[in-house]
Amino acid sequence: YVNLYGGIDMDTMQGLKRTHYCGDVEGIGNEVVVGGYVQKVRDLGNLIFIDLRDRTGIVQLAFDDSTDREIFEKASDCHSEYVLMAKGVVRERESKNTAIKTGNIEIDVKDLRVLAKAQTPPFEIVDDTNVNEELRLKYRYLDLRRKVLQDNLIMRSKIAKVARDYYYEKGFIEIETPMMIKSTPEGARDYLVPSRVHHGKFYALPQ
């Protein structure tokens, strides 16, 4: 354990390396290591199920009577948006979930690491969250964890790559210089940097 961030005990990733993203887990009997955010915890007493989420999807972590007691208790203390690393064996899921890609399998957890704890978020991190835009913008870093917004960012990245690849193939060179970037009204804050060439003048560098 390490003791950081106000005395909260958290685990390290030492000895674990991710083998699969949550949405890509497959192969019954395979040993896998996954990491991500806690989407939901279902504590049924002698059974605990945790939906673990990353940008590719969700996979269910399972804890039962065969689980090491320390790991079981650690799972029972988990809450929404905790960051976990889990190692275990893929097995068939008794209660199938056709709504997700990994709905036919689950991970029988043998090792669980709590990498970061979290307070209860101001709104639920789901695509159909019912919250006003002002609150979403205030907690933009949480809002961007929702898949619908991540899909937009991924699409934007792909479009930008296609455009760049096209111009690179045509012999264009991409440059970024503050003298060719115009400040925008109501845009990001500008930083004023003195010019070493034109004394008494400044560059306005958009944040």
Question: How would you name each of these model-derived features?
Answer:
Residues Y1-Q207:
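Class II aminoacyl-tRNA synthetase catalytic cores and aaRS-like
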